Amino acid sequence: MKTPKVGFVSLGCPKALVDSERILTQLKTEGYQVASDYDGADLVVVNTCGFIESAVQESLDAIGEAMSENGRVIVTGCLGKDEDKIRQMHPNVLKVTGAAAYQDVMEAVHEYVPAPPKHNPFIDLVPEQGIRLTPKHYAYLKISEGCNHRCTFCIIPSMRGDLVSRPVGSVLEEAAALKRAGVKEILVISQDTSAYGVDTKYKLDFWNGQPVKTKFFDMCEALGQLGIWVRLHYVYPYPHVDAVIDLMAQGKILPYLDIPFQHASPRVLKLMKRPAHSENTLEKIKLWREKCPNLVIRSTFVVGFPGETEEDFQILLDWLVEAQLDRVGCFTYSPVEGATANDLPDHVPEEIKQERYERFMQVQQQISAAKLQKRIGQTMTVLVDSLEDEYPVAVARSYADAPEIDGNVFVEDIDKSTIQPGDMLEVEITDADEYDLFAKLIKIKSV
């Protein structure tokens, strides 16, 4: 009997990527092979995104391609919440499941492609850390599912439910397994990382025989004991985040915070129903930087939200200049089916959204460029992601750069025979542009 093969298409954010990794790990554990193309697959699983309309369309297109090339398709992920929409375009998909529905996906696979009856785990070993879709030297660590907030532009809670935190012992054991597998950097993700454990009332758990609370600070403190890079994403500026800044100042975890502020106008934040919108974020940023001077803050913003006036937008620009954030992403507001923001009055015309986006990015580019210029002459530790094919250059990142969303550090004039992805280098910064740094090698710190 030939080994059954399953094709896999993974779309969406890092949280969806982790869902894909878990499904692939289970498939491999049960003896399935992962097909490298549609033709060789007995069926195809498509993990979808449904956050904004462009992502919905990309997901529907991916389902269509899988149906055309293979014909046997199981759909999962955030868009799976809207089965009617999927079946309206692709009525012959085998099964539709929701986000993080690992067991439902496996049951559907079993129904259409039964697992091999005699799987030998010693022949087809699954690594302790599971199947990963990231490079070997970094990995995403998802600590919870869902969200308790009801931001008016977001439909994630309707897709993924309310906050459900993983037991901290499970989180820490996964992190330790990743380190044992050679991972140098862990990126902590969820819908609301700083709310971790709220739903469990900070339940006590155990790791390495020691009691640990299922709580944001306690988890970060324990992760800091691993001796590898720990990077925090999707953090809201709650008061208890202040204590984690102390861990950053002590060098326990990376001095890097990804905080989706989304806007600065109190009126717009109220329309968005953003959590912590009443916090004086500028004062908080100042306090954090006093505690940890090398702190890097990344954020994302939405311009052109319904009801946003020119005055609101100017408040945002002024805030941006004062905040001096290191890394910033910006999006024009896009209506999302099912979001309550669609019902708000005074939608902003597309041409004004675009004009505000361009003004926003122009201001932030100047800030980013000036901050990177100050790095010239500094010595930094960087993690190598890849080597350029045609040039003696290592593409790396410092503590200030998350993969894929931030800039890079290009280490020039290296001997490529001595360096590989996953190496830690000590470099001197020699130049900068709006987003990236350029450096020369001082020494290889670790391999």
Curated annotation (Swiss-Prot):
Its cofactor is [4Fe-4S] cluster. [4Fe-4S] cluster 2 binds at C147, C151, C154. Residues 373-443 form the TRAM domain. [4Fe-4S] cluster 1 binds at C13, C49, C78. GO terms for molecular function: 4 iron, 4 sulfur cluster binding; aspartic acid methylthiotransferase activity; metal ion binding; protein methylthiotransferase activity. It comes from the Bacteria. Binds 2 [4Fe-4S] clusters. One cluster is coordinated with 3 cysteines and an exchangeable S-adenosyl-L-methionine. GO terms for biological process: tRNA modification. It is an enzyme of class 2 (transferase). One of its GO terms (cellular component) is cytosol. It catalyses: L-aspartate(89)-[ribosomal protein uS12]-hydrogen + (sulfur carrier)-SH + AH2 + 2 S-adenosyl-L-methionine = 3-methylsulfanyl-L-aspartate(89)-[ribosomal protein uS12]-hydrogen + (sulfur carrier)-H + 5'-deoxyadenosine + L-methionine + A + S-adenosyl-L-homocysteine + 2 H(+). Its EC number is 2.8.4.4. Its main location: cytoplasm. Residues 133-370 form the Radical SAM core domain. Gene3D superfamilies: Methylthiotransferase, N-terminal domain, Nucleic acid-binding proteins, tm_1862 like domain. Signal peptide: none annotated. Keywords: 4Fe-4S, Cytoplasm, Iron, Iron-sulfur, Metal-binding, S-adenosyl-L-methionine, Transferase. It is found in: Cytoplasm. PANTHER family: RIBOSOMAL PROTEIN S12 METHYLTHIOTRANSFERASE RIMO, RIBOSOMAL PROTEIN US12 METHYLTHIOTRANSFERASE RIMO. Catalyzes the methylthiolation of an aspartic acid residue of ribosomal protein uS12. Belongs to the methylthiotransferase family. RimO subfamily. This is Ribosomal protein uS12 methylthiotransferase RimO. The gene is rimO.
